[in-house]
Amino acid sequence: MPFEDAVESLADTLRVRVSEPTARRQTERWGAAYVGVQEEEVKRIEQELPLAPAGTDKMLLSVDGAMVPLVGGEWTEVKTLVLGAIGEPEWEGGEWKVHASELSYFSRLMEAESFGRAALGETHRRGVETASQVVAVTDGALWEQGFIDYHREDAARILDFPHAAEYVAQMGSAVWGDETATTKEWLSKQLHTLKHEGPKDVLSELRMLVQDHPELPELSESLAYLEKREAHMQYPMCLAQGWPIGSGAVESGNKVVVEARLKGAGMHWARDNVNPMLALRNALCSGRWAEARSQILTHQHLQVLQTRQLRRERRLTEQATALAATKALPSTQIAEPASETPVPQLSPSTDTHPSNASGPNKPREPWRPSPHHPWRHSPIGKARYRRRSHPPSAGK
């Protein structure tokens, strides 16, 4: 869901209003935190080498790439891993088909070698190492084979049947033309043989086309691609084992997990923001949103504590450095005042108050005004009139 739609949905359902830039920043912040959680899990596995949990009896492993647009008109490949439990074959449309359930996804924008290491947390969690059988269905790209070697070297490798059919169809179209009756009839026969009898007779037919049409160099290129992957086209054996022969799970993952959110109309992403968005999409589409939310909040809380601890250690280090530098100075430099103006020193025998000249230990008495001080003659607090005293009369 684009950020604009998410903001409107939040306002309509919860009556909470936030701006689109705020929604974008918070989403990218949460995504970056979840990327950090998954990276820490990879480091933990590499350091502690814990036992892998039990995997399923038959596990599907499929990897593929999808292109997403970046800012500036550039396009780049996002790699996606899909893991799932292979179910029992089901009769559909006149043939047996195999489906996988409990699908989980891991997607990243990075080089193939780094992607293989980054996916270690997901493959360990799903028990790829301990699964009885791992079936790896891919389009045959070299980086995909390296990924399989890293996580489960003994996995049964299958070239996606529609991908093989595409190369066969290209050769028929080059000889007889696109969508002609001859091409359709020839292609139908070759694909039926490839699925139910194996690649041997089909490759022989394709070699004859190359010999008969040396003027078409594209035939040799398609044939070389298929010959190199002959061991991965044993489709009759795969069907007998109940294994899938198509990479529909990862192709669907490319569309639903990656392209539905990052390849919309008018969307262009900064490279640094692609993996945070992919991490959140993986959590949502794998049914782990509640778990991811808890891990993200814990990770952010720990980051705050670590930042505080680093600041405290830096402050203590600066204080210790300043104290050590002060102790290293000569005593004369420490005693000198900062100002060059000399400060007059009072002699111990000098007293600024003459009333205390009798000795330094005599306590200072409170100051009292003299009898003739104007305060003594103030009428305030005194009777304004006094009764006059008369002398006694002489006759009495």
Task: Tell what function each PLM region has.
Residues M1-K396:
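Catalytic center-proximal scaffold of phosphoryl-transfer enzymes
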